[in-house]
Structure formats: C-alpha cells, structure tokens
C-alpha cells in the first residue's frame, strides 16, 4: 500500500483553512432565456476563502492581501471573454458564456489573471468573500455543460 502526504510550508501571516483550498461552487441549472443580452448574468452564488491563524503583529507586519484567480478564458472575442473563466472547449460545453468572480464588498469583477483589490487582514481570522455567476459574452448563449476551474494565489503586503 501507499500513503501520500501533501502540503506546503509557507512564509505568510495566515494560512488558508483546508476546507477552502479546494471548493466546488454550484451555479445551478440556468435557462438560456436568462441571458437576454451581452453581459447578462445568472443569479449570483456567494463563496469565501477563510484565512486563519493570522499574525499581523511584530516588526513590519503583513496586514493586507490580494488574491489572483487564474484559469482558461472564454474562447473567442466576445465581450469580456478574456476576463471570465471558460466553461470548456468540448462540443458538449455551453457557448458564449463564462464564469465571473466578483469582490463581494463592491460587486467588482476580479478579472482572470489580475490581482484583486486589497483586503485588510484581521488578527486571527479573515474571510475573503466573493460572488460568482455565469455571464454571457454574446447575445445568444448556447446550452451545454458549464464547468469552470480557477486556481487562486495570495500575495501578502
């Protein structure tokens, strides 16, 4: 038999709780009729990434953090396609739609591959909160599976 051990050692003021390292956000089954124009959105789903054991004391403490989400963009040149997270290239994938991640505080889109606005850290625990939804990149959205993946990284300041 085999036992695998995974993890990492980080030089950071906080650590991400294990349950938030890998999440699945259910955006549900959305009718194509919901997307009546370019930029139309599905109902949002909130999610968070909780940081724990935050130590923001000492000399030159790191008290702020940004997050960057990286993933495959929506194929093509539709409105906002490069800013959103693509739902796949398979023939069974939905077309002209992507997943948006927005900052819960301001409802501002966090563009694919671009760091977010700054979040302030609190001693102990801080939860970074977001909203996700499907967004159309063209006037006509075609049905299909709509699963996207985004990797995240944190930069402390």
Describe the function of each predicted region.
Residues 1-157:
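Mature extracellular/passenger domains of Gram-negative fimbrial/pilin and adhesin proteins
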